[in-house]
């Protein structure tokens, strides 16, 4: 048996399971390890990595793109209705993401930051950019405050793990870009007023 020198984290609902693996082992072996070492009991789980469903059970983990410290999403398959035949079709990752509470929670975190920026920081930002104070000390204080609050939101976004999801990565990137533009505009305004 090969030495298991790498670790992957399985995200299953709101639970996290670190699993020791050898990246040369097959997906089938990983699933067997999951059943042995975790509370996951369903043999027919669906695994997703980087937004793609892992289906080829004979492929090695490294061939599937997994690395040390990779995060894998594990979901239960929906129970089949009576009389329907189980089909081995590729399920698009976005649908799986929309149904998974982990992805919903992460999307909610991103949206909460966006709402905070819109409701709390945008009025301060607009006031500073459109009506900067004539008092240099007050203007500098406003700039430092709005810059600090915007940077805090960037740090929060940086801490949001999108689990390899392209959709969530895009949402986070859009919000980072929006906040960065606001910061750039604050800096530009302070330079124009100082000139």
Swiss-Prot record:
It holds the Pfam family BAG. GO terms for cellular component: cytoplasm; cytosol; membrane; nucleolus; nucleus. Residues 6-72 form the Ubiquitin-like domain. Keywords: Chaperone. CDD domains: Ubl_ubiquitin_like. GO terms for biological process: protein folding; protein stabilization. The keyword Chaperone applies. One of its GO terms (molecular function) is protein-folding chaperone binding. Residues 83-98 have a biased composition (Basic and acidic residues). Residues 78-98 are annotated as: Disordered. PROSITE patterns: BAG, UBIQUITIN_2. It comes from the Eukaryota. Residues 109-190 form the BAG domain. The keyword Chaperone applies. InterPro entries: BAG_chaperone_regulator, BAG_dom_sf, BAG_domain, Ubiquitin-like_dom, Ubiquitin-like_domsf. Inhibits the chaperone activity of HSP70/HSC70 by promoting substrate release. PANTHER family: BAG FAMILY MOLECULAR CHAPERONE REGULATOR 1, BCL2-ASSOCIATED ATHANOGENE. Binds to the ATPase domain of HSP70/HSC chaperones. This is BAG family molecular chaperone regulator 1A. The lineage of its organism: Eukaryota, Fungi, Dikarya, Ascomycota, Taphrinomycotina.
